[in-house]
């Protein structure tokens, strides 16, 4: 505020709690990038009745539900499924186990999250979805960080395609 900032704009903020550290006099706006991803899936997945939006964990269910609602608002009402992954971690960035909650058999699953960091959660979720009969597994994330082992994990994964925005610049 003392620097003259009167508004902060973010895209799919990872930790909404940080907005509480901003002065009440400073406006805070967070925009969702989900609509940018929906268009890619609408144009590239032929049978929309076989799409299932998947939350990679309980923390992302609101985002997945919003993505699901926006998909339906794009003309696919009552055609798109919704599922969730339940994951357990003992330490940060290391997922011990994931369980599928919902019907994904024969579906084109789209895992929706705000960011992909080391891709551990994403790759384990994709594998679990395929083990439960998913026809294909895609991912959409606003922020593609791709830290540390992410590239090798993704290369070795069962993921069919990852779609991210350009919110994080990469040299390669």
Walk through the language-model features, giving the residues of each:
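PRPP-associated nucleotide enzymes
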Residues: 1-172
């Amino acid at each position: 505020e003392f620097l003259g900032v009167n508004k902060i704009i973010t895209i799919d903020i990872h930790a909404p709690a940080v907005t509480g550290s901003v002065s009440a006099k400073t406006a805070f706006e967070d925009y969702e990038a989900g609509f940018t991803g929906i268009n890619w899936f609408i144009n590239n997945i032929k049978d929309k009745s076989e799409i299932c939006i998947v939350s990679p964990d309980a923390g992302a269910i609101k985002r997945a539900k919003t993505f699901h609602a926006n998909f339906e608002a794009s003309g696919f009402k009552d055609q798109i499924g919704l599922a969730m992954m339940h994951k357990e971690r003992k330490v940060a960035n290391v997922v011990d186990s994931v369980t599928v909650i919902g019907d994904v058999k024969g579906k084109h699953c789209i895992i929706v999250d705000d960011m992909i960091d080391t891709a551990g959660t994403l790759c384990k979720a994709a594998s679990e979805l395929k083990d439960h009969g998913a026809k294909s597994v895609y991912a959409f994330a606003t922020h593609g960080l791709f830290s540390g082992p992410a590239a090798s994990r993704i290369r070795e994964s069962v993921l069919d395609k990852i779609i991210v925005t350009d919110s994080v610049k990469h040299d390669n």
